[in-house]
Amino acid sequence: MVIHLGDHWDMPSLSSYDKGKKSYEGRRYKADVDAGNEGMEMLLSRVKRMKNRPRMVFLKGNHEDRITRLIESDPYLEGAVGFQDLNLDAWEVHDFLEPVEIDGVHYAHYWINPLTGRPISGSIDNMLRTIGFSFTQGHRQGLWAGRRELNNGKAQRGLVAGSYYQHHEKYLGPQGNFHWRGLLVCHEVHDGDYNLMEVDMPFLRRRFGPQS
């Protein structure tokens, strides 16, 4: 099984935060879509050669959801732009913030405080206590992993991993780009618990990148 936690398409052309800034100049919707589709083709190239393809789950992130907000603010664009532009045919797609439960672990792009609508944040221990069940999310750069042993003999897992890329983010500045980046493999997933294996970007480059 492969689970993509979202924000594959960055969609900077639809960013409401950067409009009017010099850095916004030259951004185009089509360029954003094409970049994400090209990356998706690269991601799926090995999977498509497999005889027995795994279940593949894609959770829309807040960056993909910029398309939804665009159509809501400018309804005349409906049909001209939309999620049909994104190369998601190979995936079981779930809407932004829609929870998906698999083997006792609940997945979403991020988890919100139901009273405020804001993302639950803080330390992984705080998130475990606040959310109350085994969860995995993306959204935040870096890696946070936690485990609570419960009095009923079960365990609660918390996992936050929202960075799978090689570039630096300008908005994070010169001191904010040292976060962990990579993918995670969860073995023996059952009843909300699992054995966790971290696979960081430097390892992936050495193992699968061009050989000099």
Regions found by a protein language model. Give the residues of each.
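Non-catalytic C-terminal accessory modules of carbohydrate-active enzymes
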Residues: G209-S212
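A generic local structural motif
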Residues: S45, V93-D95, I120-D125
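General small-molecule cofactor/ligand-binding pocket signal
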Residues: V57, D89-F96, A108, L159, ...
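Conserved beta-sheet core of the metallophosphoesterase superfamily
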Residues: H106-F203
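Short, acidic/polar N-cap/turn motifs at the starts of alpha helices
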Residues: D95-P99, L183
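Alpha-helical hydrophobic/aromatic positions enriched in membrane-embedded helices and signal peptides
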Residues: R53, E101, T130-I131
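Beta-strand-turn-beta hairpins that frame and shape the catalytic cleft
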Residues: V100-H106
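Core catalytic region of metal-dependent phosphoesterases/phosphodiesterases
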Residues: M1-E92
